[in-house]
Amino acid sequence: QTNWNTDFIVDQPYTSFKFFFTANSADPGAQYPVSGFMKFSDGSNLQVINETMNPPIGTGRMFGPFPAIPGKQASQMNFKVGASNDPGALGFSYRISVQGCR
């Protein structure tokens, strides 16, 4: 089972959110689409990350902090890491996490 599309549960109110990505392996020329969404209890969402990365192995990247949206209750943070179009990039591994900040 891959984790290219991962939801992180938000179980309390936070003032902002940070997304973290670290490549454990990568093909030197491969490009990976990365996107992140704030999902809300009313079913709506807001895209906060939309870019293509060529991550060096062992290098981390923080996205954010993204402020909480007034009047909206965050229910999940969603992180998507897509596949590269480069066939040599198969087997790419990475770590992702999301942090809620008070």
Each language-model region and where it sits:
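Mature soluble domains of exported/periplasmic/lumenal proteins and thiol-rich metal-chelating peptides
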Residues: 11-15, 32, 49, 53-54, ...
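Short, surface-exposed beta-strand/strand-loop-strand elements in extracellular ectodomains
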Residues: 29-52
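Glycine-centered loop/turn motifs
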Residues: 31, 58-60, 74-76
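Short, surface-exposed binding/anchoring microloops in extracellular/periplasmic proteins
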Residues: 1-34
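Beta-sandwich interaction modules
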Residues: 3-12, 56-71
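Noncatalytic modules at the cell exterior or secretory-pathway interfaces
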Residues: 19, 65-92
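Short, solvent-exposed coil/turn segments at beta-strand boundaries
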Residues: 16, 41-44, 72-74
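Exposed low-complexity, polar/acidic, P/S/T/G-rich flexible segments that act as propeptides
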Residues: 36-38, 44, 82-102
